[in-house]
Structures are given as C-alpha cells and as structure tokens.
Design a protein with these regions (language model features):
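Short, flexible, solvent-exposed loop/turn segments with mixed acidic/basic and small polar residues
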Residues: 1-5, 84-90
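Short low-complexity stretches enriched in small and charged residues
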Residues: 17-31, 52-57, 96-102, 156-163
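Conserved short beta-strand elements that form part of the metal-binding/catalytic scaffold
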Residues: 34-85, 128-150
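Long, hydrophobic N-terminal alpha-helical segment
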Residues: 1-49
Length: 163
C-alpha cells in the first residue's frame, strides 16, 4: 500500500448499527451531537455489491460534531457491506471513514492502483459513492464520494442545523 494520503478530503465517520434510533441515542449521549437528519428506507441507485448488481435498502442519519460528519446506517434489506458488517459485528460500530472527492473515477483508479478492493458502489442522483477495503486496515472501510450540488446543500443545512 502507498504511504501517500488517500484522495480527497476526510469529512465523515460512518457507523453501521442494528437499530438506527438506538445508535443515534448512543452518539448523542457520547458526543453531544446535535440532531440528526434521518432518511428512511433509501434504495441505492445503480447498486453494486461484491461483483454484481444489488438492491441496497437502508435507513440513515447525518449529523455533525464540529466539522466532522457522522453518518449512521441501519441496513433494511438486500445484500450490502452494511449487512455484512453486522454479521461480523452484531452490535454495530465504526464501519468507514469518508473522503469527499471531486473526480470519483480518478479516485477509484487511485485506490485500485494502491491495492484497495472495491466492495460496494452506487449513486443518488449525481452523487457517486464507493466503499473500499484494504489489507492495511482490515477493520474499517474507506468510502470515497463525489457530492452533487443537492447533497452538498443538504449537508450544509445539516451542519447549520437549518433543516
């Protein structure tokens, strides 16, 4: 693996939990996180998981502590890295570190060239995301995400607590 920094800008810690409400209560108690925006039963567009098309349905919530975004995900249905994580860690925990990139395809090529393995990808509108695993960090995935204008605006509103 390369000693160069990962592409993009670190912005997110992602948790996967078996129960979204309990996970949010835990983070609020632990971190004093303000309220989270909750999105229920979201189906990923163009879902792909471990080599083939996938229907990935999950609920998720976003909140900020300072400049760090916390994403909390509860898998609902389908095969996904989220369900796979809960099979290994039934109580849930830190699943990924998220990096915002301007060029998703170039960042993907960079990670693959470093020996990372693409596990899951999908889109929401023009937003593209992918989860990667590596032997360097077997417990936590790396997510790269290109944020379209709508999602950037939503995240700004969440950070400002104006949603």
């Amino acid at each position: 693996m390369s000693s160069r920094p990962l592409p993009g800008t670190f912005f997110q810690i992602g948790y996967v939990v078996p129960n979204l409400e309990a996970g949010l209560a835990h983070l609020n108690a632990k971190l004093g996180a303000p309220r989270f925006m909750v999105l229920r039963e979201i189906v990923v567009e163009n879902g792909w998981f471990r080599g083939g098309p996938a229907t990935i349905n999950h609920s998720m919530a976003f909140g900020y502590v300072g400049d760090v975004q916390f994403e909390v995900i509860e898998p609902v249905a389908g095969n996904s890295t989220y369900a796979e994580f809960l099979d290994r860690v039934p109580d849930g925990g830190v699943h990924h570190l998220g990096f915002s990139v301007e060029d998703y395809d170039a960042a993907t090529a960079d990670l693959l060239a470093r020996g990372y393995k693409l596990v899951q990808r999908g889109t929401f509108g023009d937003t593209k995301f992918g989860y990667f695993e590596s032997s360097d960090d077997p417990g936590t995935m790396t997510e790269i995400v290109y944020l379209d204008a709508n999602v950037r605006g939503m995240f700004a509103n969440i950070k400002a607590q104006t949603f």
